[in-house]
Amino acid sequence: MDISISWVVIIVSVLSYLILMDKWRAAKLPKNIPPGPPKLPSIGHLHLLRGGLPQHLLRGITQQYGPVAHVQLGELFSVVLSSTEAARQAMKVLDPNFADRFVDIGSRIMWYDSEDIIFSRYNDHWRQIRKICVSELLSPKNVRSLGYIRQDEMASLIRLFESSEGKPVNVSEEISKTVCTIVSRVAFGSAVKDQSLLLNLVKESLRMASGFELADLFPSSWLLNLLCFNKYRLWRMRARLDNFLDGFLEEHRVKKSGEFGGEDIIDVLYRMQKDSQMKVPITNNGIKGFIYDVFSAGTDTSAATILWALSELTRYPEKMAKAPAEVRESLKGKTSVDLTEVHELKYLRSVVKEALRLHPPFPMTPRLCVQESEVTGYTIPANTRILINVWSIGRDPLYWEDPDTFNPDRYDEVPRDIIGNDFELIPFGSGRRICPGLHFGLANIEVPLAQLLYHFDWKLPPGMTAADIDMTEKTGLSGPRKNPLILVPIIHNPTS
């Protein structure tokens, strides 16, 4: 009996403490915070984020409580933005207040203590590395000059699919390998020798680094930090990545130049590292972090978008007929497609826009509000974690007719760009933190897709119908397909 009473006292005491801590944290918040669901002591709204993808679950919350809603993730007060106006205010009107990134365990470990560009804090280091990226590495001019790499690798892929005509092929695997080779030749100056290892490292690390860690959500708990086993797995993954990148960097130092003697990304970064005029020194970790950015954001996302576009076209035969017809009419008699020609393919570019709307490369854009701000009439406290639900905004029925339907023709009536000016469609973000590799990524999507539609008719394997195509998304930063896309290539325009 005494033991039972003791346990009751302990449980009541713990619950009382947790409730008091919640009330203390709530008392520190401004009065006019965004609305949110009822929360539980200590864990807040974590129980509402089980059993689905975060962007889907958070959309359900904002549909019920409004496009600007707060969620309490453990100890962390967070705000979800799921409307074009809220995104516009955060990314344009109040951009300096929302240009920072919050750093969690996954990004700190896998992105080299935020010395990269994607997860870097908004500071002099970020400004410097972004300037290098935009002016020296991934400018539109440089992207065009690298067209021969895309042509080489796509020619190899086309030949591979020609050799498999009439047979089911794993399109997901082959496109991922091709995009990886394109990116590695740009980054390293040559193709990666152990490409499958690199692809597996990138995909596995992205999976492990996505999602919520309890140690992140309860930063005051040393015990949860100690017991965060995924943290140790991430460090082991980081060690494997270090070993891989160190080997390539050392090999690159020996070669001292990229293909045909020109500068590649590593050459430029090494040159900048030696520049005594740099405001913030570029470290070896900074170089590795940038290279990891290029692969994680450039390989997985570009390949995923091509595959989503092919998946959607296969589900809608009338769209599949229209897209190749435009490409073939425009490029009649040619054996390859370059970036200049792709820019003239209006319907193909609408197909890419629509794939990016329904399946954005980064479904959730993380930001950090660095000073108290007002968004759509609500007060956002300083140091609030912001989650901009790009996936939800792209499916908002207020701005999109039949929002869940793949319809590239919609852009004939209301043309929208994807470079951050139209906040109904922001797959690459907007404002200061817009993706610096935007032009590089689009080139690696549009050119391969045009080639695939120009040379082949794509059919489903025997016994499958459009309704059988699995469109399930997988957990991850880039929202990829859960299962591989299997299609049958039928040659339409042979390469020889």
From Swiss-Prot:
InterPro entries from the UniProt entry: CYP450_71D (IPR052306), Cyt_P450 (IPR001128), Cyt_P450_CS (IPR017972), Cyt_P450_E_grp-I (IPR002401), Cyt_P450_sf (IPR036396)
Alphabetical list of PROSITE patterns matching this protein: CYTOCHROME_P450
UniProt membrane topology term: Single-pass type II membrane protein
Cofactors that this protein relies on: heme
EC number(s) recorded for this UniProt protein: 1.14.14.-
Pfam family, one: p450
Tissue: Expressed at low levels in flowers, leaves and stems.
Chain positions recorded as heme binding sites: 435
CDD domains to which the protein is assigned, alphabetical: CYP71-like
Subcellular location: Membrane
GO terms (BP aspect): defense response to insect; response to insect; terpenoid biosynthetic process
Keyword Nucleotide-binding appears in the UniProt entry: no
Keywords: Heme, Iron, Membrane, Metal-binding, Monooxygenase, Oxidoreductase, Signal-anchor, Transmembrane, Transmembrane helix
Gene Ontology terms for molecular function: heme binding; iron ion binding; monooxygenase activity; oxidoreductase activity, acting on paired donors, with incorporation or reduction of molecular oxygen
Entries under SUPFAM superfamilies matching the protein: Cytochrome P450 (SSF48264)
Function: Involved in the biosynthesis of phenolic monoterpenes natural products thymol and carvacrol which have a broad range of biological activities acting as antimicrobial compounds, insecticides, antioxidants and pharmaceutical agents. Catalyzes probably the C3-hydroxylation of gamma-terpinene to produce thymol.
Name of the featured protein: Cytochrome P450 71D179
Species in which this protein is naturally found: Origanum vulgare
Gene designation: CYP71D179
